[in-house]
Structure formats: structure tokens, C-alpha cells
Amino acid sequence: MMKRILFATDLDNTLLFSHRHRQPGDRCAELWNGAEQGFFTPETVDLLPQAARQVRLLPITTRSIAQYQRIRWPEGAVPQEALTANGAVLLRDGEIDRDWYDQSWELVRAHQGVLRDLLERISAREDVASARIVENMYVYAACSDVAAAERCAAAWAQDAPFQMEVSGRKVYWFPPGIDKGTALRRAAGRYRPERILCAGDSVIDVPMLRRADLAMIPDGTLLPALPAERTLVCQENVRFPDFVLRTVLAQAGPG
């Protein structure tokens, strides 16, 4: 069945969230080393399969392939496609789409030396707990705390021709073209949807949210960067994943 609506969504802190935000009744969405790491709300578990039947569900996440594959989706809600590595790697039924990957590789091939050099120098910092190149596409650093992430970002802000983003204690360096907006544009070219809905919570999501016919955000933090007439802010006293899925189903109409 051709689905006329494309629902492109961030994952962490949008559809699922960590143990720090867990509430009674939440369902485990991810195990890591045997421990419950991520969670869905009960309403998300109920609504996500309905949404998956009515719209094309397309996660777009900074997660690596391995991190994405740890997610335990509700029955009937496993996405057929997902864009990992900030949109650089398309998984179709769990397998890498080689055409998509090759196109992404062309965007980053000339930057591989800079990526490796940046990784080497960032890894040497005492306030960086871990750093790596994700799927050959971008550099990621996990710092000891939020203040360390800000220091790390300040130290390398002008060091490479990349887009740098800070999210909590994490810092990302994305080469040109490795952003969620570019990924969504490429996906829309493939799927030709009539309408695009997007949900996200961080500055990394802004390029994707700007391309939406309707964008959904958890609060007003990102609103200055988005077209207000095409952006919905989560209602008070409603958990963001539930707000997102209620909105998607309302936009899709009767199933």
C-alpha cells in the first residue's frame, strides 16, 4: 500500500527516552549489557503500531547501526526503513541499502583524513570519556560532563569544515551533507510523499524539522529556528512521544 504521509522522526528523547526520564508503567525499549536502557510510554506502545499502519514511519537518528538495532519495537511497529548515522546509512529490513550508503560516502570521502585527525586529537583530551567515527561518516565524543562538552566544543569550533553540535555531554562533528535535513530530502525524493510530518527535540533535528509540512517539538526552545506556522509545540502535561503520535494519527485520518 502506498502511504501518502511520511513521518520522519528522531528517536532519543522523541519516541523513546533513557532511564532518567522513566515513569511508572513505562515499557523497556532497549537493553544494554543486560540492563534496561531505553523506554517507551504505555501510550506509545499502543499508538505506534497504529501509526506504522497508516503512515511511512522513518526514524532518522544519530545512532550507529548497532545502537539502532538494540531497540525493541512494539509488535507491529518495526520500521521497514530507518536512517542511522544522522541519515547517512539507510537500513531496509535491517540491511544496509548500498546505493544510499554509496551516495553518502561520496559526501564524506574527501573528509576522511580530517575526520581521523580530529578523532585523534579529541581522544587525547582528559575530559573526553570516549570518541569515535560513526559508520565512517562523522565524529562523536562523549565527555565527562556537560561543562566538559562545552569546553571541548569551544576548543575545536574552528578546527574542521564541519557542522558541530553539542547535546548534553555529547559533541558531534558532521561533514557537509551529513545532516537530517539532507537525509529527509533524499528520502522524500525516493518515496514521493504527499505530506511530511517530523518530530525532534534538539538542534541536530532542526534541518529535518525545517523541511516538514508539520513539525512537532517538545517545548519552545527550538521555535525561533523553525517556521511558526508549520510547527506544533507539545501541550503541557502531555508526554512528548504521546503528543507526537496523537498528532500523526490525527493528520493521517481514519485508518
Per-region residue spans from a language model:
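Short, well-ordered beta-strand core segments
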Residues: 57, 82, 196, 215-216
